[in-house]
Amino acid sequence: MWIGWIEFDLLLGDVHSLKEKRSILRPIIADLSRRTEAAAAEVDAQDLHRRTVIGVTVVAGSAAHVRGVLDRADRLLAEEHPEITVLSARQGLHSSRD
């Protein structure tokens, strides 16, 4: 079994409240989950208006499949969501045999 994760540090556009932030993030997180078939959630910086951290994780039988899903999530955020700026992305891959 392989477990992979990617964590995105994001800068949001012209956001002035947490309510505005949620209205931007909710569809992005839903899109990530739907199009990558992985779990996605806001995992840090919940109290900041213009910054957030989104995590995506996937469990699969092969490392290649996990890498493919994480790469797809990375491309999706970078190419299809102009309302955000990806400041950094960190990822990890672990085997159940580790």
Residue ranges of predicted features:
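Residue-level preference for alpha-helix termini and adjacent loops
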Residues: D14-S17, E42, D47, E83, ...
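A structural signal for short, well-ordered beta-strand segments
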Residues: I6-L10, I54-V56, A89-Q91
